[in-house]
Amino acid sequence: MEGLVPVQRLPIKVASPSLYRCNNSVSIRRSISGFAMDRKINFRAPSQFSIRAQQSDLKESLAVSSSSVEDKGNVLRIKEWEVEMYQEELAISQGIRIRRKPPSKAPLGYSGPFELRLHNNDADSPRNILEEITWYKDVEVSRMKELNPLDVLKKAVEDAPPTRDFVGALRMAHKRTGFPGLIAEVKKASPSRGILKENFDPVEIAQAYEKGGAACLSVLTDQKYFQGGFENLEAIRSAGVKCPLLCKEFVVDPWQIYYARTKGADAVLLIAAVLADLEITFLLKICKKLSLAALVEVHDEREMGRVLGIEGIELVGINNRSLETFEVDISNTKKLLEGEHGRQIRERDMIVVGESGLFTPDDIAYVQAAGVKAVLVGESIVKQNDPEKGIAGLFGRNISHT
């Protein structure tokens, strides 16, 4: 992250909420509630990292610190800022380009291992739309958690209907049609294209996609930037659509996965440009516990290498849109599937999903030849007056069950 200068090595222990090092593990807390909200999930990653909640340490932290800083509220802000700096350092080491929060100045009274220098007045401005959305999600999720506490969601999950096999549906579609399995996207708008469909009825569109041969559906749940909503996901599931549903959300917190499960999701999206390896590993554990599939999205070779180093991933999405220029180049799919990466994917029998820039049968043929077994398509079919015909036009023939 520009302007972040580590002044000294990590200390042996930093009071919670923070990151501390013990003999063979590291624990990370994102905030008061913590990134690891589910105490029941314990695991040991190959790097000997583990995540666990440490709620009780917070009171000790405030008690110890109050002698030097009178304002306990500021002590808490200092500790939260401190762990964010550690997380940013970890993200930088993994080549993650999306900053999780604005690089604001440290809180009053801070004295620690990090020094933040702002080189220009735009340091607190998002560098691209994905970063802007990520920053907004952090605020939005904090607000939603107050309305829907995790304990309430866990109880709701127990009463939720069982999930459908998202990965299995893609494999079956690929076998049945000879084409990549289609994940058709229910999307009203996007930041780059604006309104895609004025008369937007999510249930009607979902039913048309299913009739047209879609194996699975992707439902945008972001309201601010895509004019979607969790109510769309819930309505499609309640309407009896049989296609497994991907919750297309920008996940920055485990709470969102529980919430998606209560609204009818069968799968969730995890973006490698936003999430550190340790976070992806932990979120995959939650997905497994909730019987959800996870589509892990990458944009470049470094992200692909990171993802292939994480156990438990079955679905990898290659987004052909550049984070820097926002230009779309479907040759990115071929590039990322060549050489060692492609060999590992074939050996592990992973499903690669081609994303962005797919409009014609030639586009589908190109990414299929590169090695994808599924495609995620939104704009080119949602804009059609008849989505069924749009799907047939995309593949060059009818791929429906009839």
UniProtKB/Swiss-Prot annotation:
Kindly state one GO CC term assigned in the UniProt record: chloroplast
Q: What is this protein called?
A: Indole-3-glycerol phosphate synthase, chloroplastic
PANTHER family with a match to the protein in the record: INDOLE-3-GLYCEROL PHOSPHATE SYNTHASE, CHLOROPLASTIC, TRYPTOPHAN BIOSYNTHESIS PROTEIN
Recorded hits in CDD domains, A to Z, give: IGPS
Q: Which NCBIfam families match?
A: PRK00278.1-4 (NF001372), PRK00278.2-4 (NF001377)
Q: Where does the transit peptide lie?
A: 1-65
Q: Which organism is it from?
A: Arabidopsis thaliana (Mouse-ear cress)
The function of this protein is:
Indole-3-glycerol phosphate synthase required for tryptophan biosynthesis.
**Entry's Gene Ontology BP terms:** L-tryptophan biosynthetic process
The GO molecular function terms of this record are: copper ion binding; indole-3-glycerol-phosphate synthase activity
One Pfam family name is IGPS
- What domain of life does the UniProt record list for this protein's source? Eukaryota
Family to which this protein belongs: Belongs to the TrpC family.
List the expressing tissues. Answer: Expressed in leaves.
Subcellular locations according to the entry: Plastid, Chloroplast
Q: Which catalytic reaction applies to this protein?
A: 1-(2-carboxyphenylamino)-1-deoxy-D-ribulose 5-phosphate + H(+) = (1S,2R)-1-C-(indol-3-yl)glycerol 3-phosphate + CO2 + H2O
